[in-house]
Structure formats: C-alpha cells, structure tokens
C-alpha cells in the first residue's frame, strides 16, 4: 500500500486554512483531518476523502463516493476540487457543522 506524503497533507491543510481550525494526525501512515475537534476527512494514498454529510452532498452536487481504505464506509472522494482554497475550506466547514459532536470519552473510575 502507498502512504500519504507529509507534503501533500501539509498542502491540503494549507488549502483548508480558511476554516481557521484545521488539525491533522498521522494514523497508520495515513492522516485524519480534524476541524473544530471533529474528524472531517481522511487522507489515504495521497487522496482526500471527506466524511459524507447531507450538507456536504448538497454543496458538492454529485460527489464521487469511494471507501478511504478497504472495508471502510464510502466517503466523498475529492479529486481536483481541493485546488480551490475557498471551495475546499467551505466544504470542510459545512462538513464539520453537519457532523455530530465527538462523544465525550468515558472516564475510567
């Protein structure tokens, strides 16, 4: 399997900077992208997969759906549209807004 290049992840994070709150974390050679504390996208094999939401689907219009990795649920595969900083920042913002808040971690007693 290929992994994602850090340079590609840094480029995407820069493209998404308009959201004001992008973070990413390396997981198994790939990256999870966070916006406002929610996982909004995965970057696998240098491809961007945005979590599917109704609002994101409406914004994209006719998204390409594909699993980020074998066995995963489908995500929205974003191919060249991330070259447009305003567009990708808006999609990430919409996705973060539409996703449920992260579940608080149960404290072990």
Task: Mark where each language-model region is.
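Charge-dense, helix-prone N-terminal extensions
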Residues: 1-109
